[in-house]
Amino acid sequence: MPVVYGKDTPKLGFGLMRLPKRGFVIDVEQVKTMADLFLEAGFTYFDTAYVYPGSETAIRKALVERHPRDSFTLATKLFAMAAPTETAARKQFVTSLERTGAGYFDYYLLHALMENNYQRYEKLHLWDFVREQKEKGLIRNLGFSFHAGPELLDKLLTEHPEVDFVQLQINYADWENPKVSSRANYETARKHGKLITVMEPVKGGNLANPPRK
């Protein structure tokens, strides 16, 4: 996992995309228990996103309002495809700050870059915007999550050397999968000297229950 101002981040993150619910509402009390246990085990990295329904608000209640700000690291994401205009895209950042109450983001990602959408991040001038927020101290580490092949990854990292880290889908089942390109993307990020965070390490839970045959 990345390094925050010289402090090694323990190598396990808490993904906040799918949180427990009571009916149709996130069970914040259960999330509090989960967050507390995660911190007690020595881990610190929490990962949410603007487009995860209710997640940013839940993590404010379960984590930010209950623990010292320097006891955890928080990542969230901006998704250009959920923004019809540049103004709307920038508003996502402000809204994420308000929802989480975090004051700043230890990690901030442009969300889910792939072949059919990466140009929209350029069109909406979002690379410039997130650089500005980092200069203001509202972002500590800047990155993007990625869902494509090594050619596009190489292009993006060449054009945006300011990136501190990249989030990749990596697991042993997809290491040589041409549709995921775990190995090739990992090697490309390393070639550029970028730190890597991993998503889908157990492939959506499938690797926790592999088929018997």
Task: Give the ranges of each region predicted by the language model.
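N-terminal binding-site loop/beta-alpha segment at the start of enzyme catalytic domains
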Residues: M1-F72, F129, E135
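Active-site mouth loops of central-metabolism enzymes
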Residues: M17-E29, K77-A88, E115-Q119, K213
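A structural motif
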Residues: T9, F43, A102-F105, I139, ...
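Beta/alpha (TIM)-barrel catalytic core signal, keyed to glycine-rich beta->alpha loops juxtaposed to Asp/Glu
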Residues: L113-K213
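Short, acidic/polar
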Residues: F24-L39, T85-G101, A148-T158
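A short, structured active-site edge motif that brings together acidic residues
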Residues: D70-A82, Y108-L113, Q169
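Conserved, mostly hydrophobic/aromatic
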Residues: F14, F38, F46, I59, ...
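Active-site groove signature of glycoside hydrolases
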Residues: L97-Y118
